[in-house]
Amino acid sequence: MPFYVERLALEAGATQQSIVLHVTLLTGVYALMQLVFAPLWGRWSDRIGRRPLILIGLGGYVIAQVLFGLSTSLWLLYVARIVGGILSSATLPVSGAYVVDMTTKEERSRGMAWLGTAASLGVVVGPALGGLLSRQDWHLNWNAAHFKIDSFSLPFFAAALLGLLTLFAAWRWLPESLPNTLAQDAHLAKDRSEKTKSDWRTLLKTLFPLLALTLAGQFALTMFEGTFALFAQAKFDFGPVEVGYVFVVCGLVMTVFQAGAVGFLAGKISEMIQIGVGFALMGTGIALLATAQTKPLVFVFVALLSLGMAFIAPNLSALVSKRGGERQAGASLGIQNAANSLGQSVGPLLGGVLFIWQTNAPYLLSGAVLIALALGIAWKVVVKRRAAISTL
C-alpha cells in the first residue's frame, strides 16, 4: 500500500512529508472504522449468530479490495478504506467468538493461537504475492472515468479473489456455532434492550486492564507497520519486494510460534506470564530495529518483535473471552477489537509524525513503552505469587 499511495500522491503533486501523512492516515482511518463498528458487530453476533456476520465481513473485505485496486485518486482510496473498515470489522471479533463457541476454557488459548496462525499465514502470503504482482513489467494500463487498472492494482484484485473464494467456502461449509440463536434473541430482546448500557459498562470495567494491554500492543505494532516501508526505503533503499520479504519473515515467525509454542504452552504457563514475555521480546526487537546498520539485522530484529507478538495476541484474546464470559463472547472480543483499532488508529498517525521529525523515533518510543509494560507485568506476577505463598 505505501508504494501505491506514493504514486497517486505524487501524481496529485504531494510533497514527501504529505505522502507519509497519507500513508499513516489511510492506515488509521481503517482502524478508526473498526474501533466504532467492531463492538457492534460482536454484540450483534451474540444475538443473531456468528455465521451471517462472518459472511458480511468477508463480503465487505472483497468490496474494499476491488475499490482500492480501481482507485485513481487519494479520495477514492479513503472511500475504499472506510467501506472496508466498516464491513470487514465484523470478521475478527466474530471469528474469535466462533472459536470460543467451539472450545472449552482449557482449550481456549490453543484455539486462539490457531486462529492467530491462520491470520499470520495471510501475513506470509500477502506481502510476497503483493510484491510479485506489483512488478512494473506487467505492462497493464487501463483507464475508465475515476478508475484505473495497472501493475499496482493487481495485488488488491488478487486479495479480492482470495476473499471471494473464502466467502464462498464459508457460505457453503461453515456451520452456525450458536444453536437456536434467533429463538433466544426473540425471547430475550426486551431484557437485552434494557440491559445493554449496563452490560457495556460492566464489560469495560471487567476487561479494562486487558484492553489497555491490547491497545498498547497494537499501538506499537501498527506504528512499526505503518512506517516500516518508509523507514526501510529511507535507511536501506528497500523497494516493494524487499519490504514484502520482511513481512513474510514477520508472518512466518508468528505462524510457527503461534501454532507450536503458544499452543504447546497453553495450560502449562499462565497467559499473563506469556504476555509479559511477549512484550519484552517485542519491545526489544522494535527498539533494536532503530539501531540496525545492515539489512540482515533488519530481518533478525523484525523476527524478534514478531515472536513477541505471537505470544501476546492469542493469550490476550483467550483472557478476554474468559473474563467476559461465554454468553458475551462476541461483545467481549468486539470491545477488544475496538481497543486494537484504537491502537491501530493512533499508532500509524503518531508514527508518521515522529518519522517526519526523526527516522528512528517511532521505534525508540514504542520499544520503550513495551519494555516498561513487560516490567510492570513481571512485578505484578511476582507480587501475586508472594501473596499466594504468604496465605499458605
Q: Where on the chain are the PLM-derived regions?
A:
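Juxtamembrane intracellular "pre-TM" segments in multi-pass secondary transporters
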Residues: 175-216
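Intracellular juxtamembrane helix-capping segments at the cytosolic ends
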Residues: 90-104, 311-324
